[in-house]
Amino acid sequence: MAETHHQVTGPEEAPKPTPLFEAAVLISLALAVLALFLFAWLGNEVLQGDTQHFDLTVRSWIHGFASPGMTRAMTAISLLGYNILIAELLIAFAFFAWLRWRRAAVWLAVAMAGALALDMTLKYAYHRTRPTAYFGAAPHSYSFPSGHALCSFCFYGVLAGLLSARTKSLAWRLVIWIVAAVLVIAIGLSRIYLGVHYPSDVIAGYLAAAVWVGTVIVLDHVRKVRSSRRIAG
């Protein structure tokens, strides 16, 4: 327990904002705006059918790595992106409760509720039919954007943002973000490998999630700054 508190802050407490951290928040906001424009552009390309060559080429290339062992691994990785998110959320909430990070738990809940709503809304807006799955039957929902890519990005991205903002060690902040990035990328690749999404679906999921994650991180930072000012005043 003592070791944990050397790495993370106490209940509802965050490290004092530094120029580096302030810059990171501004970068998050800028990336969210950029992701919004890129998603709009990609969505239009999909509706026009202009991503077909790219999608088929990448799908074929990734499928070239198929093997029984790889399929088992990718199936397991894919579960982390959607199917067992409820269990992962409960673990995260329990961790936040242990550290008495009530507001962090609220932000994570808001982020995931928004992610699910965003996924359903965008799928029905674009009505893209799924590709033929390589292993088993494809899900019955629409294909664009990838819900696994969107939800995993939101969950691990917001979780990394909340943890790193409340972690004192710069080294641990880097570790948190690296682990989150590896998980998100692996989950996206697993959906392409299994054949249940086009590559453009996965990219779109990442872009949509980046908009939402950037928004949540900025709002969390604004809340902490206002709280600090009230305490100081």
Residue ranges and their predicted role:
Residues 2-85, 125-136:
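N-terminal transmembrane-helix/juxtamembrane module of multi-pass inner/ER membrane proteins
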Residues 39, 43, 70, 118, ...:
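Alpha-helical membrane-inserting segments
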Residues 10, 15, 135-233:
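Membrane-embedded catalytic cores of phosphoryl/pyrophosphoryl-handling enzymes
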Residues 40-41, 120-130, 186-197:
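C-terminal ends of transmembrane alpha-helices
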Residues 21-25, 29, 104-108, 173-180, ...:
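Residue-level signature of transmembrane alpha-helical entry/exit and packing/kink sites
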Residues 53-56, 88-89, 95-170, 174-178:
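Membrane-interface loops
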Residues 83, 87-92, 229:
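Membrane-helix interface/capping segments
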